[in-house]
């Protein structure tokens, strides 16, 4: 039960009724309904009177007074108050909250599972790092974000495909092959010198050694050999998959840019755009910030992306006649649409912000506005040790890898901490803090709440009467129940906005409400969860504890994190 949607539905029905009775002239109100930030203002507030006032051209207080009388008739509502310039605050009956508590324990971890996706197919593309080396920590943030978002979308009823686009065409791959070829020669005993611009990483040595073992000297003088290319990319992709596996990330599909180009998908997709009159030969203006002496205007093949809200039209071919990277992007998204995906999400680093409008333009053009794409950007991660900036340099070379971080703090900690900030905000990751067993460590704080709940259930008397939730009436108990009741609403909002960090924030809120309630028992023995002389109240409180454990476990399952029943 999403109590906020339930009350919203009642309000909509009431507005339609009032319109039919001639009390108001419109019922179409895009109003807010959510829990107030201050508990004294009730359980739910809405600005519906203020929204209606604009349509009715009346004082919002006057409309609020009419609506308040009507809302008081709802079975779920105990009291209605008008606040400020027309806000309506509703206090729900205590029985509503007890009923939701029962529902949580009936549904267990399925509480919060929704069907807003209606089993629609959705493609979530994330990581898609160039296959030139191990995943660095920026990729790790994107990997966790994409994976958890995919899990979240599954929870709300979408049929999700997790995809990785292999950027295995272009200059960076040529550079990689030349770098591996040197390592191959080195493995055969030749002395090498790694020239500027090549990849110097030690991770390439085993690939060169593998080539030498498998082919001996057969590939010498064959730097551009397809065998070297295929072996290298296969080896690098295996490294990337191992890194992602350490993070708990697995993709369903890997799509190769190189294979797309070979299949003729670029030519096919460009022809479709051309047939729609969206490709032309023209000239681009000098980009802002570009020095005139470094800019030469030339006639180019262009895509009319400005027709779809982009800032400029986009070049499809380079000066040498080869396709641009953007042309490959067109082919790739044409391929997605051809596979039946009308809903797409792409995760990119914040340095790719300029791609957002052009990708939306392409998808809109190729699908005649039938397909939708959402581009989510992730920002950088700063690392600290006890508040001091640190740089880690291990076997991976001169950059911090995903493997380095997971091996330092563990998979679950890495996944959770990566979502303690909104994806487009800079994230600070303190190695010392995330290993602390304190409330300053977010994942510990949440896991400790779950473990504490299971400890209480293990230590409770074995023979308890049937739980009666109506015995739960203290402020702390009701606040925890109300916090748990928000879970379906949190899940839906997080999924609709593609913001899985909202789950993190909510779990911390739940953990805090529980820890505070547990703390009351230190100063007031009657507030303890287990009361040997009051088994009925103990049973009711264990019922609440059980519901809390279900909700936390449900939330952690979206992160693919195992909830702990005992802290080590």
From Swiss-Prot:
Its EC number is 6.1.1.19. It comes from Wolbachia pipientis wMel. SUPFAM superfamilies: Anticodon-binding domain of a subclass of class I aminoacyl-tRNA synthetases, Arginyl-tRNA synthetase (ArgRS), N-terminal 'additional' domain, Nucleotidylyl transferase. Pfam families: Arg_tRNA_synt_N, DALR_1, tRNA-synt_1d. It catalyses: tRNA(Arg) + L-arginine + ATP = L-arginyl-tRNA(Arg) + AMP + diphosphate. Monomer. Keywords: Aminoacyl-tRNA synthetase, ATP-binding, Cytoplasm, Ligase, Nucleotide-binding, Protein biosynthesis. InterPro entries: aa-tRNA-synth_I_CS (IPR001412), Arg-tRNA-ligase (IPR001278), Arg-tRNA-synth_N (IPR005148), Arg-tRNA-synth_N_sf (IPR036695), ArgRS_core (IPR035684), DALR_anticod-bd (IPR008909), Rossmann-like_a/b/a_fold (IPR014729), tRNAsynth_Ia_anticodon-bd (IPR009080). A motif ('HIGH' region) lies at residues 129-139. This is Arginine--tRNA ligase. Its main location: cytoplasm. It is found in: Cytoplasm. The keyword Protein transport does not apply. One of its GO terms (molecular function) is ATP binding. GO terms for biological process: arginyl-tRNA aminoacylation. HAMAP family: Arg_tRNA_synth. Transmembrane segments: none annotated. Belongs to the class-I aminoacyl-tRNA synthetase family. GO terms for cellular component: cytoplasm.
């Amino acid at each position: 039960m999403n109590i906020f949607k339930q009350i919203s539905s009642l309000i909509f029905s009431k507005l339609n009724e009032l319109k039919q009775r001639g009390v108001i002239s419109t019922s179409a109100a895009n109003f807010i309904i959510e829990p107030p930030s201050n508990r004294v203002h009730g359980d739910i507030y809405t600005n519906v009177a203020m929204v209606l006032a604009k349509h009715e051209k009346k004082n919002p207080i006057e409309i609020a007074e009419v609506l308040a009388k009507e809302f008081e008739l709802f079975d779920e509502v105990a009291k209605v108050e008008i606040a400020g310039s027309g806000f309506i605050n509703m206090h729900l009956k205590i029985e509503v909250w007890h009923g939701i508590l029962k529902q949580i324990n009936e549904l267990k971890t399925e509480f919060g599972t929704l069907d807003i996706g209606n089993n629609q197919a959705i493609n979530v593309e994330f990581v898609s790092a160039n296959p030139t080396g191990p995943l660095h920590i920026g990729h790790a943030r994107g990997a966790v974000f994409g994976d958890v978002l995919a899990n979240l979308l599954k929870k709300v009823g979408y049929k999700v495909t997790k995809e990785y686009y292999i950027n295995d065409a272009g200059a960076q791959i040529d550079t990689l092959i030349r770098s591996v070829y040197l390592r191959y020669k080195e493995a055969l005993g030749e002395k090498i010198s790694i020239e500027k611009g090549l990849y110097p990483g030690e991770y390439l040595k085993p690939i060169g050694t593998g080539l030498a073992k498998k082919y001996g000297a057969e590939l010498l003088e064959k730097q551009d050999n397809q065998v070297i290319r295929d072996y290298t990319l296969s080896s690098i992709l295996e490294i990337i998959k191992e890194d992602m596996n350490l993070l708990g990330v697995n993709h369903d599909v890997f799509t190769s840019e190189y294979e797309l180009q070979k299949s003729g998908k670029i030519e096919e997709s460009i022809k479709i755009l051309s047939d729609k009159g969206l490709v032309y030969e023209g000239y681009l203006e000098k980009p802002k910030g570009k020095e005139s002496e470094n800019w030469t205007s030339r006639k180019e093949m262009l895509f009319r992306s400005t027709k779809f809200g982009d800032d400029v039209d986009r070049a499809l071919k380079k000066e040498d006649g080869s396709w641009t990277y953007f042309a490959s992007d067109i082919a790739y998204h044409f391929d997605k649409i051809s596979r039946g995906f009308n809903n797409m999400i792409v995760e990119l680093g914040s340095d790719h912000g300029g791609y957002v409008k052009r990708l939306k333009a392409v998808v809109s053009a190729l699908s005649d506005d039938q397909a939708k794409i959402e581009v989510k950007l992730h920002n950088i991660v700063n690392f600290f040790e006890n508040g001091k900036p640190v740089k880690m340099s291990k076997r991976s070379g001169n950059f911090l890898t995903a493997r380095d971080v997971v091996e330092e703090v563990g998979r679950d900690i890495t996944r959770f901490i990566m979502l303690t900030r909104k994806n487009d905000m800079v994230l600070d990751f303190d190695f010392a803090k995330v290993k602390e067993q304190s409330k300053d460590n977010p994942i510990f704080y949440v896991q400790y709440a779950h473990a504490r709940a299971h400890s209480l259930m293990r230590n409770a008397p074995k023979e308890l009467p049937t739980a009666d939730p109506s015995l739960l009436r203290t402020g702390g108990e009701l606040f925890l129940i109300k916090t748990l009741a928000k879970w379906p609403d949190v899940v839906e909002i997080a999924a609709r906005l593609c913001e899985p960090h909202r789950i993190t924030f909510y779990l911390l809120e739940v953990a805090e409400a529980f820890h505070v309630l547990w703390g009351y028992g230190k100063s007031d023995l009657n507030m303890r969860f287990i009361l040997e002389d009051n088994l009925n109240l103990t049973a009711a409180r264990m019922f609440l504890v059980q519901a809390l454990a279900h909700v936390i476990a449900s939330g952690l399952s979206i992160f693919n994190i195992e909830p702990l029943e005992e802290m080590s």
